[in-house]
């Protein structure tokens, strides 16, 4: 399939090509166009033309990803940019128009025939097209991912994951991905009455949030399992948590603000990080412990928060996310050999510390009623853990 799709790439060169990559093949940023991608592991750059057309091919599954960039005057809408591709490749398509980052966008399931020449029988291909408007009238970004029609179901999660992890501006790092936004639109906000720190608080959550976040978890878990016997499993695992974190950011933000308001005392700001960490740890430690060994074994974060239940992963990630939203530095620590996850926070205190990026983080055991810094001896060794870093808004303030 790879040779065939390199030919397909050149055949439609006026339609697709690649960008100025300043990071690895999986994590890319284009300084000239201002967008970024965090592709699943093992996508390899197979071809490019300038900084406008790229072809990536996956090393495990037969999936291709083509990227095309167009100057702003070429089209008036994201739909027009997508229709340019539909016409050139003679695609049949089913469109889902939606709004992402306050701009009209288009997601389309597509199918088309391809043959490198008349000597070859046309082959049926299936996939997805995502068309986005870049900020500041920079231009249009169109992504096409596809595979053989008979492989479409097997490869769908990988294809969707590659499209859903695109970033077009600073705040898009904290925004539900475009594909999830299109497929799981907001429905109706509801108010949650909640008890935190012996206080009654309330916050809003959308009725679609739990299902949408669960869909991301299930999809990314499916992608993650491809790497179980591969050298880059840890990198894939880190990406798994980062994508869930990103999707949940806006879904959890109203709750984090309510918690912050209940804790913050403008007349006594000293020790706020320690206070917030202790209270959030107490909250998640009192969740009901539940696991779903049949699936991803990970409770979606909106449901974990509102229903106060989940396992170590969901509790620890929820705690880290809420601390980050209060501008408190925290990391997720995951131990494959111990099948465990904990939060770790940069705040005053004593106990088991983990050093990461030159900082010391106190371990937070979310599934036992112990204070910050108390981690069981049998799992406390640093070599048992790998860290997961997340984007924070302050990282982009100087950009």
Regions found by a protein language model. Give the residues of each.
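Hydrophobic/aromatic-rich core segments of domains that either
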Residues: 302, 314-391, 398-399
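Conserved polar/disulfide-associated segments of primarily extracytoplasmic proteins
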Residues: 48-142, 149
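Secretory-pathway-linked proteins and extracytosolic
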Residues: 194-251
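N-terminal "mature-domain start" segment
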Residues: 26-49
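Surface-exposed amphipathic alpha-helical segments
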Residues: 43, 143-182
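Bacterial N-terminal signal peptides that target proteins for export
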Residues: 2-10
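Secondary-structure boundary elements
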Residues: 237-307, 367
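Bacterial N-terminal signal peptides
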Residues: 10-18
């Amino acid at each position: 399939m790879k040779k065939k799709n390199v030919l397909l790439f050149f055949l439609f060169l006026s339609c697709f090509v690649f960008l100025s990559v300043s990071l690895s093949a999986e994590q890319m940023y284009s300084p000239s166009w201002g967008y970024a991608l965090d592709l699943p592991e093992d996508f390899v750059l197979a071809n490019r033309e300038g900084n406008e057309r790229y072809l990536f091919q996956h090393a495990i599954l037969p999936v291709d990803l083509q990227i095309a960039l167009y100057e702003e005057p070429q089209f008036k809408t994201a739909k027009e940019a997508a229709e340019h591709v539909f016409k050139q490749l003679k695609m049949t398509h089913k469109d889902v128009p939606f709004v992402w980052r306050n701009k009209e966008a288009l997601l389309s399931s597509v199918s088309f025939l391809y043959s490198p020449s008349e000597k070859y029988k046309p082959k049926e291909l299936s996939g997805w097209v995502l068309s986005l408007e870049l900020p500041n009238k920079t231009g249009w970004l169109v992504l096409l991912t596809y595979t053989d029609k008979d492989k479409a179901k097997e490869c769908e999660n990988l294809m969707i994951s590659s499209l859903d992890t695109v970033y077009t501006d600073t705040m898009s790092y904290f925004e539900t991905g475009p594909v999830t936004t299109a497929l799981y639109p907001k429905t109706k906000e509801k108010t949650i009455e909640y008890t935190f720190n012996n206080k009654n608080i309330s916050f809003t959550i959308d009725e679609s949030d739990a299902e949408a976040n669960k869909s991301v978890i299930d999809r990314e878990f499916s992608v993650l399992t491809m790497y179980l016997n591969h050298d880059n499993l840890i990198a894939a695992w880190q990406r798994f948590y980062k994508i869930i974190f990103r999707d949940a950011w806006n879904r959890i933000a109203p709750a984090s603000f309510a918690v912050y308001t209940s804790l913050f005392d403008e007349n006594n700001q000293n020790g706020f990080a320690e206070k917030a960490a202790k209270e959030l740890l107490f909250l998640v430690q009192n969740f009901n412990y539940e696991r779903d060994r049949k699936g991803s074994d990970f409770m979606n974060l909106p449901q974990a928060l509102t229903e106060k239940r989940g396992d170590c992963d969901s509790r620890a990630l929820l705690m880290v996310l809420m601390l980050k939203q209060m501008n408190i530095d925290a990391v997720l620590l995951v131990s494959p050999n111990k099948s465990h996850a904990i939060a770790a926070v940069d705040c005053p205190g004593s106990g088991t510390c983990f050093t990461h990026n030159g900082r010391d983080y106190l371990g937070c055991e979310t599934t036992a009623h112990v204070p910050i810094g108390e981690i069981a001896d049998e799992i406390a060794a640093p070599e048992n853990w790998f860290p997961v870093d997340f984007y924070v808004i302050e990282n982009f303030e100087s950009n």
